[in-house]
């Protein structure tokens, strides 16, 4: 999924809730895109992109990985992988417990 930065937080919450309801045990929910991470320097291009998104729609913007991890935990998923990708993007893999 490459949509959580261009949709309201409620859409991300719905994505995780839906994944928890429909995924088989061990199946992945894979997120791709730019994120904010605690204790990690954010690339200036990602900061500018976040500002641009929020100017277009105040409900849009880069999400914090820590918040996603907490949301995953509340819905019965946990992060199993983090992969760095080109252009300061990440792949985050969550799996249903």
Question: Which role does the model predict for each range below?
Answer:
Residues 23-38:
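Conserved beta-strand signature within the Rossmann-like core of class I S-adenosyl-L-methionine
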Residues 42-66:
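Conserved Class I S-adenosyl-L-methionine
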Residues 75-97:
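Core SAM-dependent methyltransferase catalytic element
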Residues 6, 36-38, 59:
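Short histidine/acidic/glycine/proline-rich micro-motifs that form metal-
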Residues 1-4, 32:
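Residues lining the SAM
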Residues 36-40, 44, 74:
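S-adenosylmethionine
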Residues 6-22:
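A short, conserved alpha-helix within the catalytic core of class I
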């Amino acid at each position: 999924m490459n949509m959580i930065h261009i949709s309201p937080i409620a859409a991300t919450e719905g994505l995780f809730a839906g994944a928890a309801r429909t995924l088989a045990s061990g199946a992945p929910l894979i997120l791709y895109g730019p994120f904010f991470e605690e204790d990690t320097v954010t690339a200036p291009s990602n900061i500018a992109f976040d500002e641009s998104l929020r100017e277009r729609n105040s409900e849009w913007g880069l999400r914090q990985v820590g918040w996603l991890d907490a949301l995953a935990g509340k819905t019965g998923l946990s992060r199993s992988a983090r992969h760095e990708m080109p252009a300061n993007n990440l792949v985050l893999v969550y799996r249903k417990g």
